Amino acid sequence: MDRGIDLQGTFIQSLESLGLSPGLSKVLWMPLPMLLMIIAATVGVLVTVWLERKISAAVQQRIGPEYAGPLGVLQSAADGLKLILKEDIIPAKADAFLFTIGPALVVIPVFLSYLIVPFGQELIITNVGAGVFLWIALSSIQPIGLLMSGYASNNKYSLLGGLRAAAQSISYEIPLALAVLAVVMMSNSLSTIDIVDQQSGYGILGWNIWRQPVGFIIFWIAALAECERLPFDLPEAEEELVAGYQTEYAGMKFALFYVGSYVNLILSALLVSILYLGGWEFPIPLDRVADWIGVDPANPILQITTAALGITMTVLKAYLLVFTAILLRWTVPRVRIDQLLDLGWKFLLPISLVNLLVTAALKLTFPVAFGG
């Protein structure tokens, strides 16, 4: 299989050809993908916020943002600049250290999770063998920051919001992990690159959504609950808790919570596209299209085109899921806290366990179709 364009290897070899040592070349390479990751995720947040406002306005037969740039595309940037310039206030009776570190613990693990998200064969920051496990481990840190923020605010609404966030995250983390384990079992690997490779070769018919329809639904529901999207936004329910754990926050700290929420939503959509929708793979395999038109797979122009189309396909699949999440906000009413916990513990958890056992049985019975 063509491994695509190795950006890291090409960059390091170029620096070595200029006379730099291999160690120094790697040191110069390391900050570049991380900086690109932060910039791309931030731009993705601005685009998602603008899309949510426009789609929400269309659902309600409104216009939405209109004056800040063409079609209001700069409204999100203007709001972000406003929050950056606002005064940073710490309540007099709050724990200043925990109050400050809480938003950082919410945002940093989400950004670090992008390390294992591939956009192509070699278009990944770090292809660790246990990439999926790393993401699950990082996602378990976020509830600590939410609970810490609610506790440190010394406010009853903030504390209740933090407790709700922790309970919600713990309830849905287990079904989420079990749904991922079923995919890992079929691909025989925890690497996100290997999971996409396992879905290649047969086009849309090889995607995991056909072999794991139940796991796909469980993962997406649990991911929306982890992102605290409606109908699962109980930790910040305005009618009940003012703004939940965000009540006492202002300025940049307040913005970090929203950035973390939207970055997490985009991350969840990207992971769904990688785990269940073939990642960068097209519905019709591009290598077969190249054979039909008689193009050499080693052609550099074809490799560049394939890499660009792979990135586009991954992002399009992710934003299709983001679109469904935005529509759900205006379609499904908010659930009660008891309904939320019942859905996680009494419904999704048993179904995810049964799905894992059925996947194991199918893997033994039909090893060719289920990755035996």
Swiss-Prot record:
The chain crosses the membrane at residues 27-47, 97-117, 128-148, 176-196, 204-224, 254-274, 308-328, 347-367. It is a multi-pass membrane protein. Its EC number is 7.1.1.-. Keywords: Membrane, NAD, NADP, Plastoquinone, Quinone, Thylakoid, Translocase, Transmembrane, Transmembrane helix. PROSITE patterns: COMPLEX1_ND1_1 (PS00667), COMPLEX1_ND1_2 (PS00668). GO terms for molecular function: NADH dehydrogenase activity; oxidoreductase activity, acting on NAD(P)H, quinone or similar compound as acceptor; quinone binding. The keyword S-adenosyl-L-methionine does not apply. It is an enzyme of class 7 (translocase). InterPro entries: NADH_UbQ_OxRdtase_su1/FPO, NADH_UbQ_OxRdtase_su1_CS. GO terms for cellular component: plasma membrane-derived thylakoid membrane. GO terms for biological process: aerobic respiration; photosynthesis, light reaction. It is found in: Cellular thylakoid membrane. It comes from the Bacteria. It catalyses: a plastoquinone + NADH + (n+1) H(+)(in) = a plastoquinol + NAD(+) + n H(+)(out); a plastoquinone + NADPH + (n+1) H(+)(in) = a plastoquinol + NADP(+) + n H(+)(out). Belongs to the complex I subunit 1 family. NDH-1 shuttles electrons from an unknown electron donor, via FMN and iron-sulfur (Fe-S) centers, to quinones in the respiratory and/or the photosynthetic chain. The immediate electron acceptor for the enzyme in this species is believed to be plastoquinone. Couples the redox reaction to proton translocation, and thus conserves the redox energy in a proton gradient. NDH-1 is composed of at least 11 different subunits. This is NAD(P)H-quinone oxidoreductase subunit 1. The lineage of its organism: Bacteria, Bacillati, Cyanobacteriota, Cyanophyceae, Synechococcales.
